Regions:
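Short amphipathic alpha-helix used as the core "switch/output" element in two-component signaling
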Residues: 62-74
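C-terminal output helix
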Residues: 103-112
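The C-terminal output helix
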Residues: 113-120
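Two-component/phosphorelay signaling modules centered on CheY-like receiver
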Residues: 9-34
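Acidic, metal-coordinating helix/loop segments flanking the phosphotransfer/catalytic sites
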Residues: 35-51
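A short, hydrophobic beta-strand element within the central beta-sheet of small alpha/beta folds
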Residues: 53-54, 74-85
Length: 120
């Protein structure tokens, strides 16, 4: 399983990746991770991902989410933002979940369960 974390802040991205890794280890889910620290870096990617945590925030994060959904209908997208404004928009793009900052481990667990179809 390929998982991408898109976050401008490196420390926040590392924490999010660590929580996702913990979840994958706990439930024995083989996964490869990649962090993207800018929207342009994510836009120029070549790989496809099973799960994307989109945490660029604001209009930029939402635009990246829309762009991703247009090219990949199967990807489980978890939108992370510090305002509830994008929660409704998230539904329109068929995102798997929405996390309101600050992100906690329990939020990652819920999102991963949803992304995996409740299997674990």
């Amino acid at each position: 399983m390929r998982i991408a974390v898109c976050e401008n802040n490196r420390a926040t991205a590392q924490q999010l990746c660590e929580w996702i890794r913990q979840y994958c280890v706990l439930y024995q889910i083989p996964a490869a991770f990649q962090c993207f620290f800018s929207p342009s870096e994510f836009s120029s990617r070549k790989e496809r991902y099973h799960i994307v945590f989109m945490a660029f925030g604001g209009v930029t994060g939402f635009a990246q989410t829309r762009q991703l959904r247009e090219v990949d209908r199967e990807c489980s997208i978890i939108l992370v933002d510090d305002t509830q404004e994008f929660a409704v928009r998230c539904v329109r793009l068929h995102c798997t979940d929405f996390i309101l900052r600050p992100v906690k481990f329990r939020h990652v667990v819920r999102s991963m369960r949803l992304a995996l179809g409740g299997r674990v």
